[in-house]
Amino acid sequence: MTDIKQILTDLIGFPSITPEDAGCQKYMIQFLEQLGFTCQQLNNGPVSNFFACYGKIGPLLVFAGHTDVVPVGEVSKWDTDPFSLEEKSGVLYGRGVADMKGSLACMLHMARRFIKTYPSFPGRLGFLITSGEEGDEFNLGTPYVMQKLEQQGIVIDYCIVGEPSSSLKAGDVIKIGRRGSLSAKIHLSGKQGHVAYPHLADNPIHRISPVLAELTSMQWDNGNAFFPPTSMQITYIHCGGHAGNIIPGELNLHLNFRYSTEQTDESLKTRVINAFTHHNLNPAIEWRLNGEPFLTNKGILLESCKQTVLEHIGTLPELSTSGGTSDGRFIAPYGVEVIELGLVNATIHQVNECTSLQDLNTLETMYFSICEKLLID
């Protein structure tokens, strides 16, 4: 029988740089169909997606994840071939071993073991997998699949996202939510001119400066028990001109909010627009909502996960909402209890990305135990 390490070896061998799947999902679908899962591919443009389900009735527990990985960077800086799993003293190296093909290997191995142990369990076990998580095509992935499932009347009760949530060892941190992300591209027009004749020009840098001073000093909220205060960061400023004696005629500015449940995207938009209005400016603003904040601070799923972690590593997990966004933001709005439980994130997106064989085994065992608590007990 194929063990976790062999499954991970197979998955790492697919060079699935986002949004390419490169054969990962074909492998996973064949694996799951052999167990009796019904699989449907829901590909969308360059992004590969599939949903798989075992069982007909009862609560539906879905394991969600992504097969795509970030680029490897300079291959010469790796100590190993990034697309060939290599073990050194119990540590496994390869692009995606932690984020998140290691979790996928644990999910597959667990599913086979669970179905063999409980072939007629009173519930349903599912997989929601995309190759569009790491790049700009995320809207073609999980949110698209969720729309399709809603159209089919498929309701998910619980979802475990296999993102690398842990800090020092598998299970020590569970993500119970994530901040929202809102971006803005702002264009302010002025009038180009010579610096010696400012009265004949209109400098957009000068005009926007008091607005930026106001926005960067603003206390958006105080956060709450689960989230830090909302933050805003300016990520890009560019002006025309490109010469020391030219007043630029236009300005482009990008900013991003990471916001708590104390805010909505509309409340943030209003405050930004009001700041510009206060200074008699009316720029063109293009907004992009990357994801709303979500929080699972109670419920059967969270309690089952907390108890499972305590049983397997001897301590309760830290419950956190830190870090960037995840695809959980597209699943939670459908009323699903969502948590993230995965491997250690210390080396994700880095050269020599790695995880330990011990953590893989621990995570697989925890996934199995959670399934028992939710679908058997």
Curated annotation (Swiss-Prot):
An example GO biological process term is: L-arginine biosynthetic process
Q: Which UniProt keywords apply?
A: Amino-acid biosynthesis, Cobalt, Diaminopimelate biosynthesis, Hydrolase, Lysine biosynthesis, Metal-binding, Zinc
- Superkingdom of this entry's organism? Bacteria
Q: Which residues bind Zn(2+) 1?
A: H66, D99, E163
Cofactor binding note: Binds 2 Zn(2+) or Co(2+) ions per subunit.
Cofactor(s) required, per the database record: Zn(2+); Co(2+)
Tell me which EC number(s) this protein carries.
Answer: 3.5.1.18
Q: In which pathway does it act?
A: Amino-acid biosynthesis; L-lysine biosynthesis via DAP pathway; LL-2,6-diaminopimelate from (S)-tetrahydrodipicolinate (succinylase route): step 3/3
The record places the active site at D68, E133 (proton acceptor)
**Oligomer and partners:** Homodimer.
Which family does the similarity line name?
Belongs to the peptidase M20A family. DapE subfamily.
What's the protein name?
Answer: Succinyl-diaminopimelate desuccinylase
Instruction: Supply the gene name.
Output: dapE
